[in-house]
Design a protein with these regions (language model features):
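Conserved N-terminal segment of class I S-adenosyl-L-methionine
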Residues: 1-121, 170, 176-178, 207, ...
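S-adenosyl-L-methionine-dependent methyltransferase catalytic module, highlighting the catalytic core
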Residues: 113-115, 122, 126-127, 131, ...
Length: 252
């Protein structure tokens, strides 16, 4: 009879290179990760900011990769957890990790731009490490707000530049220039070619920009428990024009 640990090790190898490191019955899936025991090391820094008891709650994990955060949510008692990604390799890894952990989690091949197809609003939506991989990050935030976020929204993005924030005035004179030179002004850096040898890294915000994007999409920031992580609540848009109304007109 085959050793269960040997079977897990064989299957982990078959599933290719892992980005999420798990301990699956003693088998590490990404023991040489350049970020260390990732994403466990990051999770430890903001786990306290997520409700410990998710009994009866639904969770959507957007860009779930191998399902680390989906599994953490299930461990906290979430009734329904759905993870979506567009990379079938990662989804296969996620299904295997959930199976080894004895958890029922639904993993689907679905883009963030198609979340309306879920036809469901979730009590908690995770958006971890996705924004900077998207060609259209604000559109993604708008779609999440419109179609799937019922209450809590936890977002994480790689950040570069200044970590300081400023109170941005509601309007600027046409001839104003100096404010845009300030390091703390919201900035979204465009990566034309590659970052960290990854051609899918398109944008890198500074902290002021990430916060502003979240607010612009209709999310009220409740907590900032980790340098890249923001816990938000869905709010009503307060601007003079709801950009989603324009989007609906365009797509009709």
């Amino acid at each position: 009879m085959n050793d269960p640990e040997d079977e897990i090790r064989r299957r982990v190898a078959e599933l290719g290179q892992w980005f999420h490191n798990f301990d699956l019955c003693g088998v590490q899936t990404a023991p040489s990760h350049f970020l260390g025991d990732y994403p466990q090391v990051k999770w430890q820094r903001f786990a306290h900011a997520i409700p410990y008891d998710l009994s009866g709650k639904s969770v959507l994990d957007v860009g779930c990769n191998a399902g680390f955060y989906s599994i953490q949510m299930k461990e906290r008692g979430a009734e329904r957890v759905v993870g979506i990604d567009t990379d079938e390799k990662y989804l296969d890894q996620a299904r295997f990790a959930a199976k080894v952990n004895g958890m029922e989690i639904e993993f689907r091949n679905l883009s963030v731009y198609r979340v309306a197809e879920l036809r469901e609003h979730f009590d908690l939506v995770l958006f971890m490490g996705v924004l900077y991989h998207l060609r259209h990050p604000l559109l993604a935030l708008d779609l999440l707000h419109e179609h799937v976020v019922a209450d809590l929204f936890v977002a994480q993005s790689m950040l570069r530049g200044s970590r300081q924030t400023i109170d941005v005035p509601p309007d600027f004179d046409f001839w104003e220039e100096d404010v845009f030179e300030g390091k703390s002004f919201p900035r979204l850096y465009f990566v034309e070619k590659r970052f960290a040898n990854d051609p899918t890294n398109w944008w890198i915000p500074n902290q002021a920009c990430f916060e502003a994007m979240l607010r612009s999409a209709g999310f009220a920031i409740l907590d900032h428990p980790e340098c890249e992580v923001f816990v938000c609540r869905r709010a009503r848009l307060t601007g003079p024009v709801d950009p989603r109304e324009e989007l609906r007109e365009i797509t009709r």
